[in-house]
Amino acid sequence: MSLKNEDQNDLSPKDSVKGNDQYRAPSGIHLEPEEESRNDFWQFEPSNLFRHPRIHLEPQEKSDNNFKKFVIKKLEKSCQCSSTKAKNTIFGFLPVLQWLPKYDLKKNILGDVMSGLIVGILLVPQSIAYSLLAGQEPIYGLYTSFFASLIYFILGTSRHISVGIFGILCLMIGEVVDRELYIAGYDTVHAASNESSLVNQISDKTCDRSCYAIIVGSTVTFVAGVYQVAMGFFQVGFVSVYLSDALLGGFVTGASFTILTSQVKYLLGLSLPRSAGVGSLITTWLHVFRNIRKTNICDLITSLLCLLVLLPTKELNERFKSKLKAPIPVELFVIVAATLASHFGKLNEKYGTSIAGHIPTGFMPPKAPDWNLIPRVAVDAIAIAIIGFAITVSLSEMFAKKHGYTVKANQEMYAIGFCNIIPSFFHCFTTSAALAKTLVKESTGCQTQVSGVMTALVLLLVLLVIAPLFFSLQKSVLGVITIVNLRGALCKFKDLPQMWRISRMDTVIWFVTMLSSALISTEIGLLTGVCFSMFCVILRTQKPKASLLGLVEDSEVFESMSAYKNLQAKSGIKIFRFVAPLYYVNKEYFKSVLYKKTLNPVLVKAAQRKAAKRKIKRETVTPSGIQDEVSVQLSHDPLEFHTIVIDCSAIQFLDTAGIHTLKEVRRDYEAVGIQVLLAQCNPSVRDSLARGEYCKKDEENLLFYSIYEAMTFAEDSQNQKERHIPNGPNFSSD
């Protein structure tokens, strides 16, 4: 029977389906929603069914899966050496050698220079501000952004992303630094004051607080970079797929609350110890309210003035970004104005405001990470590495797709890994791509990675010449800059209604991750989000949608009878769809919902046995004196159907428990005279059934490539039975 396009049935989807199927009808078929539940399954019996021959497909020849041969083949391929392979390996690891010789100077240079300069100008104040978040001196933030920009220029494959400091990673680094400083016996309250000096910070016997802080930060950065390079080498970038958009969004928002909380003390001019560990957000607010009377009025006024300037200007930049050739570098203007006001007004001497202090020029001698610290920070570096590469890879792929080019995910992991490993020897902390700066970079005309070189040149100018001029800059200004840059993450709450309409499960994941990241800790929040997301995936497959199917008139299409009306149910056959993999988690639910929608063969068999026993008690003897044998199969009323067709199109895979469940279901139904047919099994499911010996050699005809084929087979086989049985059983409903 072919699908008729000229005279289609007037059917439409059900208005409100609570139900049992997530499939929708194919295009060209209109299904009318069902208004009332259908209690009578057998209301339609189409006639003149077209009988077509069985479909037989010849499987492809399978490749040899011998593990030993596979390993030997891979080793032979890896150990082969030629000039071409060496060239490809070098060019693959250093993408700059591929694209730089082809650089179109006339076409790209203007956009790259403009975007690089603008991002560099924006990075200067953010690098200084985020250094406080990471528990470091301002100079180290400038080092970090400088080296990251240069290294990604050499190793990166994305033309648009901006790699440098990222607030969430700075927060995570800062928590580790504070913990190790406390263990080492440094006075964090005293260290939060203005007594910061980088002169002669390393001696033969001692290392001051700022020295030890960057040692911890660079060690964590080194370990995180090693993890990221290892992920690229072993090609385990798939780990990032477990960080869904909802999970990452909730994590960033929750961590943003922690960042905001950590900056409040700078806005108020309070000298408070930085809380770390579980419940740090609540602990910090308790410290703030207990010391609110000690607020430095000068810092408070400065913070309010900076907020009044930064917030409106940032909103104007966002609203008119399509009309502005470049965003207004308001942060740089604020820093310059605040530094001048603090210097000439002598705010530190008169009012005791907290200032950035001495920022040296030039570069410090390289220093290796502290190998003795690695065992203590190895676990902390795992979350930092995963978050860093997940954000970098996702942003690079997003902008590559937008601009029509490709990036290599594994090479991106190498790039971000070495952006952490190499700078860790030069007093730097962890970096990754950042969305806000990437958007600025793209909108200002960035064409290639050359833009990163221009950004590095701006930072180099600051490091060599301008940095000491920020001596009088108030830390409250840096705190305001950090908080204002969180507005994007904190404004995600306005997207929740739309997220709720699209997916309630994703919204719950977002809330759970956000609350755990904010109220417990960032690391535990990330772990909680991942575990809860995986639990939600299991939950979705534990009790999935299941329904009985009916035939769309004048077609070979079957759809859910609970979702659509005017579907035709064939007498004597029930078609069951299960929308999930069949495995150990949902095997019992599969049986229960199948029995509920058809019949429970175990109960039917028990009823048959009881009826047989009663009949045996009333046994009769034939006139010839020979006792009749009581047939169990004829000792009960005929069942209303003879065949169950299980639609396996939505069953992605089977495990051992799933195969045993199908065997058990088939055995139970056959015991009461009902045959079970499987239809639309994908090749993976067919292979699992073959390995699990679901069918014997003479039973392979019980697997069908379409539901309609299975239904036709069931009708034909039943008709043959009825021809051999006078007054055969009636399979119509009462």
Curated annotation (Swiss-Prot):
Reactions the enzyme catalyzes: oxalate(in) + sulfate(out) = oxalate(out) + sulfate(in); sulfate(out) + 2 chloride(in) = sulfate(in) + 2 chloride(out); oxalate(out) + 2 chloride(in) = oxalate(in) + 2 chloride(out); bromide(in) + chloride(out) = bromide(out) + chloride(in)
Keywords (A to Z) from UniProt: Cell membrane, Glycoprotein, Membrane, Phosphoprotein, Transmembrane, Transmembrane helix, Transport
Gene3D superfamilies in the record: STAS domain
Protein's cellular compartments: Cell membrane; Apical cell membrane
GO molecular function terms listed in the Swiss-Prot or TrEMBL record: bicarbonate transmembrane transporter activity; chloride transmembrane transporter activity; oxalate transmembrane transporter activity; secondary active sulfate transmembrane transporter activity; sulfate transmembrane transporter activity
Cellular compartments per GO CC: apical plasma membrane; plasma membrane
SUPFAM superfamilies referenced in this protein's UniProt entry, alphabetically: SpoIIaa-like
Transmembrane segments: 113-133, 138-158, 214-234, 237-257, 379-399, 415-435, 453-473, 519-539
GO biological process terms on file: chloride transmembrane transport; chondrocyte differentiation; chondrocyte proliferation; sulfate transmembrane transport
Composition-biased stretches (Basic and acidic residues): 1-18
Stretches assigned to the STAS domain: 563-714
Family: Belongs to the SLC26A/SulP transporter (TC 2.A.53) family.
Described function: Sulfate transporter which mediates sulfate uptake into chondrocytes in order to maintain adequate sulfation of proteoglycans which is needed for cartilage development. Mediates electroneutral anion exchange of sulfate ions for oxalate ions, sulfate and oxalate ions for chloride and/or hydroxyl ions and chloride ions for bromide, iodide and nitrate ions.
Record-given protein name: Sulfate transporter
Gene that this sequence comes from: SLC26A2
